[in-house]
């Protein structure tokens, strides 16, 4: 069954060489929040927000978008695809997951990502270091979501007997996702028993990624469940035409 989700980039106004009016930026956030509320009425399953830094996007901290949108919606699943783990301290990641799950009434989805080279490089972080940090934080995240008290000793972080609050509202924890761009990363996701998201690649590569994921999940006896492929699209500018397109997307048999 196809369940339509939205993937939001929240592009910046104007161009990098021209600073936009602050009131226009404030109005942009308000307009997007109103649109996302309307997406719930159109029947979308949920929204994933992207995380990007240093230009092109107004979404450097998408958890704040979830906190703002959660009280204004009732049914939409909300998450980040994905939280760029190499930027963060793992304890803070876990604590914010707990808070957001309560602020959304148990509608949070947990998505993680390694990040993109261009943005990581601005902080003098190589992809090799980013992968190491990501793997270490992912291991801690999985442990912290399932244990009341957690300790960790790794290359980048070490601490003992942390009690991270609040615990998530969803039991055992919210659905977990991982962004993947290769068959091997898809297999790693299956071994963690998490869902995957990929996209913006050739159809044959995407097929290989999902085939590898399902094969690994089957071998482990893990029910793969929901997974997503992200793609771009355009809607007619006339409201009624756009609504008809959205309603057809909502129901594949329409």
Predicted regions and their residues:
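Acidic (Asp/Glu)-rich catalytic clusters
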Residues: 37-41, 66-75, 97-108, 190-191, ...
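A conserved active-site cap/scaffold subdomain adjacent to cofactor or substrate pockets
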Residues: 181-186, 190-202
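Hydrophobic faces of well-ordered beta-strands that scaffold small-molecule active sites
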Residues: 4-8, 47-49, 78-81, 108-112, ...
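Active-site mouth loops of central-metabolism enzymes
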Residues: 13-29, 83-91, 168-180, 235-238
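N-terminal beta1-alpha1-beta2 module of alpha/beta enzyme domains
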Residues: 1-73, 77-78, 174
